[in-house]
Amino acid sequence: MKTCGKLIFFIVLTGLCGCELNSDSNGIMVFSYGFDFSKSQDNWAVDFTDFPADTDPSAYELEFAYTERPANLGANKKSMMLSGNNHSDDLFMFMKRKITDLSPNTDYALAFEVELASNAPKGSVGIGGSPGQSVFLKAGASGTEPKQIIEDNQYALNIDKGNQSTSGQMAVVLGDISVPEETEGYALITRNSDVNADPFIVRSNSKGEIWLIIGTDSGFEGTTTVYYTRVNVIFSTSSN
C-alpha cells in the first residue's frame, strides 16, 4: 500500500485530478476529486469546535464566508474564508463534504493536497504559540459525518482528529500554515499528505459514503483567518 500511496500522490502532482484510472495489472483502482473554490462552494459546509460550551460563541468571532480571496492573490476569485479568535487555545475550524457512490464498507487509501492563503510568517511570535507554526492544517475522512457535539462542557468533534500537532484516527497533519518569513500580507501555500510515511485509510459506510474534512487546529491564542482556494483528493482501492 505504501507504493500505491506514492503512486497516488504522483498523480496529484502531475495534475490528473478529475480523471479515473483503472489498472488491471495490479488490481488497484485510482480516482480523484478536485475542488476549485474560485468556481463554486461545491457543497462544502463549515463548522467550529474545541471551545467551551458555556461561553458566548460571539467572543470567539467565528466567521465563514464564500467570498473573494485577498486582492493581491487575484481579482474576483472566490474562496472559502474561515476565521476565529482562539481564546480556548485549541480552536478547530473545519470544512466538510460528503462523497457518494463509493463501494459500501470498503477501505480506501486517500492522498490530500490543499491550497490556501495565509498571512502568518514563519518565525512569528504570538500568545500561546506562533500564528503560523502553531496552527496545524489537517485533512481526513470518515464514514460518519463530522459534527459538533457537546462533551465535558466543550464543543467537540464527534470523530478523532487528534489534537493540534498530533494526527488522529480520522485526520492527519499536513503541516502548519506559516508563509515565508519576509511575506507581507497573504500568500498562497500548498500542503499535502506526502509528509506522512503511511497512507491514510478510511472505510466507507454501508451506503458507500464518506465525508472529507479539512481544517486548522490551533495552539495560537489569537485570530486566524485563512482562505481555502483548492482541495484535491486522490482515492485508491483494490479492484479485485
Residue ranges and their predicted role:
Residues 106-123, 214-216:
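A short beta-strand element within beta-rich, extracytoplasmic domains
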